[in-house]
């Protein structure tokens, strides 16, 4: 089987066609770093043991991705309750395959100590307030996304671009955006916890959408264009097409979402696109669809796939496949579609490191393009399980010996 290391969960034919088309080609990787104060809520995320740690998770991941394990980082990888940062996976592949990496700061509280492209964004406030970002910032970030998506795709006609993310608390903002777009996502998202904290996420999302709804009514008289409140009673209802999806991001989103949406819309016009992640990238895909419709932008949905890990796709405490299929049923677009959802078959069950075996218990799961990196290794060099595991374990080994 040519794709024995890659599982296709939705849109099988389209997924197989995409894999056929890009077999043997080397992608470039664009990683968008963002921050939402939602990530500081106690218990919301396992990506950093304390809220203070979580402020620096993206900085630490970016440094490791860029410099590797021998570099003495300004921000070391944060201690996790269990597991190890997924950046070990991405770094193992990108270093071995020499895949070019471009880092983008969409809005971080502290800039990372790596060469990156600053998009002039800002961190988002907690989504529970219903006013996460200034609309001017959202518009600016979207334009930057379109610009950089076109640039990254410029010489990639026969290949594809991977867009990844690092946003602590990002599955909660993803739930908020999906819900605001009329997609029934409650109880279907993932998290970095072994058992997803659905109740905590949903309470924050409800609070944020209600506050955004109140604000919408205040601004536009009685009718309130963004009538989120009826949405919450009926998550399946579709918001009227007059609602600006960028306004939804301003209300309850994070800076990464709108940047990657812009990048992927622009890149899809000239090359393949793999959105690297699970829940967060399904939200980005839904957002792309809604933005393209609202602003009459051309894009190529059939060029886009979502690539993640098996731990996300088969998370028994989420429902990723069901969520992917739900994109057709909600969405501000009449032509809401489900993208092919691909996942690497990578397993850590036989790893000699307990931090990696923790992934098999449901910790961490994904981030920094980890799943997509493994898919790329298989597509371009036909890497199998043993080669992937050895490369990832080598990163961990080098990290543990680097400063001892």
Predicted regions: what they are:
Residues 2-164, 168-216, 238-404:
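N-terminal loops that bind phosphate or other acidic moieties
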Residues 214-240:
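Short, C-terminally biased terminal segments at protein or domain edges
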